[in-house]
UniProtKB/Swiss-Prot annotation:
The gene is SPATA22. Residues 1-12, 30-48, 98-108, 140-157 have a biased composition (Polar residues). It comes from the Eukaryota. The lineage of its organism: Eukaryota, Metazoa, Chordata, Craniata, Vertebrata. Transmembrane segments: none annotated. It comes from Homo sapiens (Human). InterPro entries: Spata22 (IPR033536). Its main location: nucleus. Keywords: Chromosome, Disease variant, Meiosis, Premature ovarian failure. It is found in: Chromosome. This is Spermatogenesis-associated protein 22. Residues 1-51, 98-127, 140-170 are annotated as: Disordered.
Amino acid sequence: MKRSLNENSARSTAGCLPVPLFNQKKRNRQPLTSNPLKDDSGISTPSDNYDFPPLPTDWAWEAVNPELAPVMKTVDTGQIPHSVSRPLRSQDSVFNSIQSNTGRSQGGWSYRDGNKNTSLKTWNKNDFKPQCKRTNLVANDGKNSCPVSSGAQQQKQLRIPEPPNLSRNKETELLRQTHSSKISGCTMRGLDKNSALQTLKPNFQQNQYKKQMLDDIPEDNTLKETSLYQLQFKEKASSLRIISAVIESMKYWREHAQKTVLLFEVLAVLDSAVTPGPYYSKTFLMRDGKNTLPCVFYEIDRELPRLIRGRVHRCVGNYDQKKNIFQCVSVRPASVSEQKTFQAFVKIADVEMQYYINVMNET
């Protein structure tokens, strides 16, 4: 009875360990803020003989909640046997361990259940029973004291990582979700495609009909005709061409190429005065040696520039064979360089026009 009273009185004093007086040994005094010396031979360490936890969690609970201390004392005093002698520790180390244990007990341990992925359980102080194991002294005798689980073992149990099955289950759930979303997207796309196909059916039928009509035409003949035509006559450029010609050659090309539109360039001397006509027209006469050519210019978008009689002018336009009139779109005085190069241009144009007329007559 005396011993239990001493223990109860010691526990109520600021949460410190009960230290029997007959086990104390001489040691160096140190301030409370420092740790005990590791090399001191007078202090016995718990790692030599025992594998105890730093402190049971009920003492840390008493330090934090002193009101619940007497109730917990009556329950816990019967569980701890009196035969177990605890190793000696300094008061400062005990106080530090109490603070660490209070931090751990208040931290709210949480772990995942092995069977359920989403359920979380908070660790309670009363869910476990204290256990203690004597390693060196009692192991050979076969005498085991009351089982008390150490704080280190609790921490190891709590720090067990999640089994790989949990991660695999998560991956399978994600795959199922993505697969279901893909299936729903495919069904919606299938509906859209069906509606689009219904709307595109008549167009598709029309395209098939056109293909059938085109297939009925013999391909060999068309390919041969086009290839021969391309070989016989190849255009050097797709730009507008102006045929340089004298008055006599212009009339000749116009007579032999009546179905084509030809734009001629004529250099000749103004041989008459410019006279106004109906519909804002101006008429004049051009002479090239012995050949004369009546010309007309319509002042629709611009006025006719001033022309000087007896000078060489450059006239560009189309020759109307029925009316025997040259419809000009551009009239201006010719430069010296144009007069020098005009004969060479006429020869080149004659060669091209002769080749063109021959090809058109053969086809």
